């Protein structure tokens, strides 16, 4: 294993999301309790918290208002190694585990969900290469994300007719000699228009259903890759969601991820991790709104005293804080299980995504209510957080779908 990755004064050397090795003292070390952090994790989170407050928070309103991609944050993340969080150290990445990266996303989500989503989608775009790629494919692509690289990735699965029902996708990949020719369309692809490297799902044999889907790595500049328009969104406007078109696009056979026909299994595996990242972002949004609401109640005076002294306000704040804490603990349990490769990880992860995103929607709505007219105004930012929270109930699987999957898993475990 190569030497440690440095975050300024902080040195970290850990095992990645995929490593089966264990180290005695690493950022990814598991403790006996879910809440206890290693010293390295504490230092990392202090650094991320300072970065979020000083560099990201002041730009959040502008990013939302202007639909501006957070270039400044991307460059800072690149300098700190945060653009390759899950890439194993031996490939030049940071080598974080799922739990640590989830905590990073929560901290950034507190101040700017667009920036958190950009970083989340960056990790998602690499997941299938890390989890399922051959050694040759990993060697070809993963080192390119090290050394302060600003290369961006995207996870391209959703199509106009294939959202919750991903088996309905129409994109096709036909093998011709030592290449695959891809034709089709993707939509709502997070980071799509800024991505340099895409992981793309397509059917290689539609007659086989789930066993006929495969995964490919596609690079920007490949003839036949066409970037469509960016969507105008309700929230998280700084992170683009884009159309992608593939017109007789040729990729070398070596860019097949894993084995042909196993793409759907790879997709489900990646989504089980994506969902806990979404949940972590949701907890961050909720925490950020809660903190702003609490501060407002201490400063806003009505009836001759701060509204924090009013019992109805105290009840609302108590419920909001309880719900956020419960969501955080459920997310931590899910990430801990996923890091341990426990078979319950995907089940608890789905629960965490559902509960945390519903919590974010409720808490941000209540934050607007607690702050009254001020909460409805842009400068106080909780209205933005309310709009951002909505997406967490939709992406990586709507909460109706995640509830259905959870229910089936509990009732029919076989």
Swiss-Prot record:
Gene Ontology biological process terms in this record: protein tetramerization
Residues reported to bind FAD: 157-158, 164, 190, 398, 400
Binding residues annotated for cyclohex-1-ene-1-carbonyl-CoA, in chain numbering: 164, 211, 275, 396, 408
Keywords, ordered alphabetically: FAD, Flavoprotein, Oxidoreductase
Organism superkingdom: Bacteria
Assigned protein family: Belongs to the acyl-CoA dehydrogenase family.
Protein name per its UniProtKB record: Cyclohex-1-ene-1-carbonyl-CoA dehydrogenase
Organism name: Syntrophus aciditrophicus (strain SB)
């Amino acid at each position: 294993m190569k030497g440690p990755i440095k975050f300024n004064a902080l040195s970290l050397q850990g095992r990645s999301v995929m490593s089966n090795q264990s180290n005695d003292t690493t950022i990814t070390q598991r403790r006996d309790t879910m809440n206890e952090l290693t010293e390295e994790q504490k230092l990392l989170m202090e650094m991320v918290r300072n970065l979020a407050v000083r560099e990201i928070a002041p730009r959040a309103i502008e990013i939302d208002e202007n639909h501006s991609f957070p270039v400044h944050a991307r460059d800072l993340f690149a300098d700190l190694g945060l653009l390759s969080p899950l890439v194993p150290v031996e490939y030049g990445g940071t080598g974080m585990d799922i739990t640590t990266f989830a905590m990073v996303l929560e901290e950034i989500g507190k101040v700017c969900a667009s920036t958190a989503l950009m970083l989340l989608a960056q990790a998602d775009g690499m997941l299938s290469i890390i989890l399922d790629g051959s050694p040759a494919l990993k060697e070809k692509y993963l080192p390119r994300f090290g050394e302060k690289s600003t290369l961006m990735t995207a996870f391209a699965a959703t199509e106009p007719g294939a959202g919750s029902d991903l088996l309905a996708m129409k994109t096709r990949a036909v093998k011709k000699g030592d290449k695959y020719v891809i034709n089709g369309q993707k939509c709502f692809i997070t980071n799509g228009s800024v991505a340099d490297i895409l992981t793309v799902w397509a059917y290689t044999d539609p007659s086989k259903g789930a066993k006929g889907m495969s995964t490919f790595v596609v690079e920007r500049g490949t003839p036949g890759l066409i970037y469509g328009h960016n969507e105008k969104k309700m929230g998280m406007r700084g992170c683009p969601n884009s159309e992608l078109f593939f017109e007789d696009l040729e990729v070398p056979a070596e860019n097949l991820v894993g084995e042909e026909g196993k793409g759907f299994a790879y997709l489900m595996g990646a989504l089980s991790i994506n969902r806990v990242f979404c949940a972590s972002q949701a907890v961050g949004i909720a925490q950020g709104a809660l903190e702003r609401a609490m501060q407002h109640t201490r400063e806003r005076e009505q009836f001759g005293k701060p509204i924090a002294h009013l019992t109805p306000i105290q009840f609302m704040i108590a419920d909001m804080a309880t719900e956020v804490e419960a969501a955080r603990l459920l997310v931590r349990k899910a990430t801990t299980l996923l890091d341990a490769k426990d078979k319950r990880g995907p089940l608890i992860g789905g629960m965490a995504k559902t509960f945390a995103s519903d919590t974010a929607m409720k808490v941000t709505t209540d934050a607007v209510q607690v702050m009254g007219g001020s909460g409805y105004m842009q400068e106080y930012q909780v209205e933005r957080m309310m709009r951002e929270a909505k997406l967490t109930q939709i992406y990586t699987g709507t909460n109706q779908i995640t509830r259905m999957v959870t229910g089936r898993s509990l009732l029919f475990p076989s």
